[in-house]
Structure formats: C-alpha cells, structure tokens
C-alpha cells in the first residue's frame, strides 16, 4: 500500500499572483514610444507622432506574452474606473456648489435644472439664462437632478459628501491599478478561471449590487420621495440615517415596517406589498415609474443573480463547467458546434471584447428606448430637453459600441484565430459559407434600399405634381404598420390577463390615458401610421447596410478571393499593390472605417425620427380645451416625403439654433456653426489624394531649405490610413456636435 506523504494531504492555497513582477519607475514616462523598438529611437519623420498614437494602447504589439497583456488590460480598467469616479465627483460637486438643486427640488415643474454659471469675461454671462426661482445659469439636460431626487438626495451637503466619497473611490481605483500590475499581479490562470469569474460577477456585482440598491431604494429613497411627493419641504424631511434607525418613522409611511422581519420568516410576504408593489404605469405626481415598483424589480433581479452566481463549478465538485456546456452545444447544422469556442474566449481578449461590446451596444440602444417609454426618474418625462439628450446619447453610445464589436472581432480573426483548432465547428462553418451570408445580406440591402427610398421618391413626385390622392399617407393610400399596432394593442390589454391587480401596463405608450404633470404631457399612447411605416423601413435599410459592411470586414479579415493571404498583411493595410481590379481599402480596418459612416447614417435617422415624432405626437400640454402638441401632429402629414423631412423638420426646427445669437442659447448657435466647420474639414481628409499633399510638402520643404530653416524632422503627408482615421474622427465629431446643438437649442426654446 502507498502512504501519501503528509504534505500532500494539507490543502495548499493556490497562489494566483506574482509578487513585485514589474518595478515601479517613472523613467518610461519620459521616453515616448518606449513600448516599441522602432518608435523608441525617436522621430525621423512626422509620421512618428501618428504611429505613437496608433500603437500606444495596442498591447498586443508591445509583447506576445498573454499574461503580461492581460495584466496591462486589467490594470488599465482600474485607471478607467478612477477617471469615471473623478468625472462623477465633478458632476456631484457642480450640483453642490454651482446649482439650483434645492430650489428645483421644491418646484420641479416650473424651475429648470442648472448646475453651471458662466463667468463674465467678455460678455459670456449672456449664457446664464433665467431658469426660474431667481437663478441665472446654463440649463442642463443630463438628468442628474432627476436621478438625485429619485435616489433621495435632499440637500447640497449630501451632494458634497458624495463628491468627496467619489474622489476617495477614484484614489482607491488608481492605487488598485498600480498594485495589481506592480505589486501583486494576477497570473494568467486567474484571468482564465471563467467559472469563478462568472460566479463573482453574477453574485457579487449584479446580485449584491442590485440588492444593495434595492436596500437603498427601500430604506432611504422611498420615504424621502413619498414625503417630497406629498409636498413636504425638503428641509423638513428627516435625514437618511433617521429612517434607518427609527422604525416608527418608516411605519408612518409604510405600516408593514412595524412588523419587522416576522412576515419574511413566516412566508407571509404579501404583508410587504405596501413598499414592494406591482402597479405598472407611471406615478401621476412625478411622471416617473413607481419607486415601489422599481424597488421590487431590483429585489427580484438581486435574487435571480444571487442564484445565478452559484451555477458554476469551482472548488466544490458541483455546478456547471463552461467548457462542457459549450462542447455539448451541437445543433443539426453546426457540425462540431461550439467546440473550440472555450479556448478562443479564454485566450483571445479581442474575441471576448467583441461579444461584450455587441451586447453592451445593444443594451445601450434598449436603454435609450426605455428612458422615454418607461421614464425611471421623477420629473424626467416632462423635461423634454433631458429626454431628447438621454435618447440621443444612448443611441450614439450603442452605435459606437457595435462598430467596436466588429473592429475587435476582426482583430481577433487576424491575430488570434487558429484554423487548426476550429475545424468544422460553428465558427468554421460560418466562415466557409461567408459568400452566401454576404451575398444574401447584400440582396437584402438592395431590396430594402430601393423599396424604402422608392416610397419616398414616389410621394415627393406625386406631391410635386399636385396629386395628393396618389400618395402613400394616412389620408390617401394607407400603409399602416399593422403588426406594430397589434403589438401595442396586445401590450396595452395584457395586464388584464397577466397582472389583474396592476393599475397600468408597462408603458403609457402602448395605449390608455395621457399622463400629464402640471399640465405638461409626460407620456401618452403613441399612434403609428404610414409615415412611421416608411421611416421604419429606412431604419431597417441603414442598419442592414451597417451590418453588411461590418460583417464582411470580420468574415473576410483573414482571406478573400482577391487577397488570399490577407491575414499576413495584418488588421490595417492600405493596399496590396496594383492590379487585380484594385486592392486598396480592403483591410478589416477599412471595413470598420466605412461601417462608422453607415452607423452615423443609421443613428442620425433614428434620433431625427424620435425628435420629430415626440414633438408632433407626444410632447405638449393638456388644457381645458384639449391636447396641444409642440408641432401639432405634423409628423403624419409631412414625414412621408423627403421634402417634408427637409422643410418641416430640418429647416423649420433649425430656426431656433440659427437665430440664437444674442440670447442665452447663443453658445448652441456657435457650436452649430463650428461643428459644421469641423464636419466640412473632415471632407478634406476623406476626398484626398495622398500624393498631392506629399508633393505640396516637398515644395514647402524646398522653400524652407532655401531659407536655411528646414526642420530636422522630415515632414511627411499622412498615410492613407491615417488620413482616413483623421477624416472619420472629424466627420463623426462634427456631425454629432451639429446634431446636438440643433436639438438642444430647439427643444430648450420650445419645450
């Protein structure tokens, strides 16, 4: 018989960190390009500074050691969190120091939020508009005031305290970033321990995070908001800790608090239905979701994720193994199925990032649609500028994330994909029939483009010929979105069957009554007609084109019929030489570049649609004479022609930004002008011949040489790729800032 040595029986704790792997030194900060042998030599030409920007964060190009790359990314995440905490601290500090928050809290329907007062240097104080309550400042549309009220903040002191707390958290994050790279750096196996990661992220971040938030909502936000809704002066409301310590205070508002935890342990949970509700609809006082519904929601989410955080097998031999789940996942048409994907996701952070960006981008777009249909914060729905800003912001974020997903998926294909370990699995099979996928997608784009645009062209032509009876419209040839109307109707009626005790459906947009706060419409049923049907198909068209470009970039990142050895050329390259009908602009990077323009098209039309539709059919006022909308319901009549969009939306609604000079909105007029310039400047880089600029530079250098003032660093024109990068950056920046100023000047003036 074999006797195991005693040391083997003692369970040793796994060491998952390396101690002091990288000495701390500031010397590298003084050496630009220290991460690359070529760049570290210093600049020979002006291209050096562009290469520096392109590669500074490309950790893959600094080293091939996956462990070191993982540590750098991990450490950088703490830096990112630190920056976020500093930014948040600044927001809360502005609320505490420069805002009219306390005044707004006492009368949120008449006073507008402001947290910035412009200093008078040479007349800039004109920007300090009268926001009501005797306060002069810039009206803000970030939604922070509504968020603060919803979370139960009643004084500027509380905002100060939170701002200081956020700075402390920022310090902790920066320290953690340094510590986990220089002092205790995790080993690669720690980064690859997916079961443990899933358990911690699900149970810790999402489960305990939601539970903590539910606790805050129940114990602090609920009593504060209940008293505020009842009209109690914020200064009279007890301090947050008093609600925690004095149960009698809570019991006055929510009687079940007097019973303590007895109903919980006796499974008599319905006792708690005074503060954990399932009402549906909006609070008529604030126009926001019921806070008791949201507390209930977060508690339920917490339970779900705490359970989910115990699903995966770690130290105890029970639970799921991610590798086993993936490898068991085989369909009738997917060959080896998901075999090999586990290896991809534990060795390629680009693959992991691509999936996460696609999901986060989609989630951001879903958030933007819920911000208006189910406004979560008090008095958010009646603050039209904030509603428009939040929708637009989350749409842009979503679009950028989805383009980023394609970028990193393509980088994965070029740098990390191993054909040998992906034989006949789902990824291999997708790649093998990529021609069918792309050609079908191409056909769909052509079909959608011609048919959707064709409807508009038809209408513009009939309109010009004076034949309104032959147009597609709600009053002539109707193209009603019957499926969307069916979905609306079903959701409006659903609670009668699925939640008989609920007071309303999930959103007032489905149907039912108008929710108005102080005579201003918060939300109401949104009627859909021919104009919506038409623009919906433009959305479908632009989204499919964006997907076509991005997906083609990913599926052909390694090889194509034109360039079979594309993987050897890398993620970005300008051309593969002359001939073959042209080999320029085929790199995966170029597909992301082109995809960004179509993403911009897609999002622009979505936010234009939203802005006009809401002003026409939702936003406005309710008086004794009935409902009056900002643009009087003109969406249905005008949005079915291109001319209608140009005349009744872009032109008619830009008057506020164009005529803003000399008013508190004049900054938007200047931004509108300046952003148009930035956008136009981008075209110089996009419609550009590189040789032209190089030739121009040569003659300028010749003149400098003649005068003996030639620089030591040789000037060079931007490379094709660099020029396109500068071009797309300015195109998007200029376009977004133009749209932003146009939207805000309009909605602040009329909303």
UniProtKB/Swiss-Prot annotation:
Bilayer disposition of the protein: Multi-pass membrane protein
What is the protein's name according to its record?
Answer: Photosystem I P700 chlorophyll a apoprotein A1
Q: Which PROSITE patterns match?
A: PHOTOSYSTEM_I_PSAAB
* Catalysed reaction, written as an equation: reduced [plastocyanin] + hnu + oxidized [2Fe-2S]-[ferredoxin] = oxidized [plastocyanin] + reduced [2Fe-2S]-[ferredoxin]
**Which positions does UniProt annotate for chlorophyll a' binding?**
676
Please report the organism this UniProt entry assigns to the protein: Ostreococcus tauri
Quote the InterPro entries the UniProt record gives.
PSI_PsaA, PSI_PsaA/B, PSI_PsaA/B_CS, PSI_PsaA/B_sf
State its location(s). Answer: Plastid, Chloroplast thylakoid membrane
């Amino acid at each position: 018989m074999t006797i195991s040595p005693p040391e083997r029986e003692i369970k040793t704790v796994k060491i998952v960190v390396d101690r002091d792997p990288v000495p701390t030194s500031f010397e590298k900060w003084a050496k630009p390009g220290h991460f690359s042998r070529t760049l570290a030599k210093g600049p020979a030409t002006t291209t050096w500074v562009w290469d520096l920007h392109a590669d500074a964060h490309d950790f893959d190009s600094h080293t091939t050691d996956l462990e070191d790359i993982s540590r750098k990314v991990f450490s950088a995440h703490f830096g990112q969190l630190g920056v976020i905490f500093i930014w948040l601290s600044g927001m809360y500090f502005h609320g505490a120091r420069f805002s009219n928050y306390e005044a707004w809290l006492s009368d949120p329907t008449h006073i507008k939020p402001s947290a910035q007062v412009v200093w008078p240097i040479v007349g800039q104080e004109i920007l300090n508009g009268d926001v009501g309550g005797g306060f002069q400042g810039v009206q803000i549309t970030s939604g922070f005031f509504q968020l603060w009220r919803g979370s139960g903040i009643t004084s500027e002191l509380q905002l100060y305290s939170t701002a200081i707390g956020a700075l402390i958290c920022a310090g902790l994050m920066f320290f953690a970033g340094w510590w986990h790279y220089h002092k205790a750096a995790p080993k690669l196996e720690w980064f690859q321990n997916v079961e443990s990661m899933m358990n911690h992220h699900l149970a810790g971040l999402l489960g305990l995070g939601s539970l903590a938030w539910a606790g805050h909502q129940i114990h602090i936000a609920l009593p504060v908001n209940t008293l505020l809704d009842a009209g109690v002066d914020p200064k009279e409301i007890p301090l947050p800790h008093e609600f925690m310590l004095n149960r009698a205070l809570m019991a006055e508002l929510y009687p079940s608090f007097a019973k303590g935890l007895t109903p919980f342990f006796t499974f008599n949970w319905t006792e708690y239905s005074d503060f954990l509700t399932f009402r549906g609809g909006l609070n008529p006082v604030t126009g926001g979701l019921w806070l008791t519904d949201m507390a209930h929601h977060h508690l339920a989410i917490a339970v779900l994720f705490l359970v989910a955080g115990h699903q995966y097998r770690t130290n105890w031999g029970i639970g799921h193994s991610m590798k086993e789940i993936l490898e068991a996942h085989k369909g009738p048409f997917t060959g080896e199925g998901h075999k090999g994907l586990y290896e991809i996701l534990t060795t390629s952070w680009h693959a992991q990032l691509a999936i996460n960006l696609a999901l986060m981008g989609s989630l951001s777009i879903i958030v933007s649609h819920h911000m208006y249909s189910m406004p979560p914060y008090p008095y958010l729905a009646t603050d039209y500028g904030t509603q428009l800003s939040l929708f637009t912001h989350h749409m842009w974020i979503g679009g950028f994330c989805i383009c980023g997903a394609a970028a990193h998926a393509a980088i994965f294909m070029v740098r990390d994909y191993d054909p040998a370990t992906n034989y006949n699995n789902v990824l291999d099979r997708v790649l093998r029939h990529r021609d069918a996928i792309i050609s079908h997608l191409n056909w769909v784009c052509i079909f959608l483009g011609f048919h959707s645009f064709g409807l508009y062209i038809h209408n513009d032509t009939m309109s010009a010929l004076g034949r309104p009876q032959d147009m597609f419209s709600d009053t002539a040839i109707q193209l009603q979105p019957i499926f969307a109307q069916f979905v609306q109707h079903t959701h409006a009626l659903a609670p009668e069957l699925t939640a008989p005790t609920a007071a309303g459906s999930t959103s007032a947009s489905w149907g039912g009554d108008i929710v108005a706060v102080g005579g201003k419409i918060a939300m109401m049923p949104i009627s859909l007609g021919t104009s919506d049907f038409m623009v919906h198909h433009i959305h479908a068209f632009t989204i499919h084109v964006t997907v076509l470009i991005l997906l083609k970039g990913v599926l052909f990142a390694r090889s194509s019929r034109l360039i079979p050895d594309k993987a050897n050329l890398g993620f970005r390259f300008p051309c593969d030489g002359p001939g073959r009908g042209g080999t320029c602009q085929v790199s995966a990077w170029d597909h992301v570049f082109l995809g960004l323009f179509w993403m911009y098209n897609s999002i622009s039309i979505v936010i234009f649609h939203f802005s006009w539709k809401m002003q026409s059919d939702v936003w406005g006022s309710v008086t004794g004479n009935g409902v009056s909308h900002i643009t009087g319901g003109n969406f249905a009549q005008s949005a079915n022609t291109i001319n209608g969009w140009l005349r009744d939306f872009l032109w008619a609604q830009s008057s506020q930004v164009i005529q803003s000079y000399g008013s508190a909105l004049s900054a938007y007029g200047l931004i509108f002008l300046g952003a148009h310039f930035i956008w136009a400047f981008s075209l110089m880089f996009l419609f550009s011949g590189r040789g032209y600029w190089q030739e121009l530079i040569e003659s300028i250098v010749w003149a400098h040489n003649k005068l003996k003032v030639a620089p030591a660093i040789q000037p060079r024109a931007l490379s094709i790729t660099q020029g396109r990068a500068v071009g797309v950056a300015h195109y998007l920046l200029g376009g977004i800032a133009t749209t932003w100023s146009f939207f805000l000047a309009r909605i602040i003036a009329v909303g």
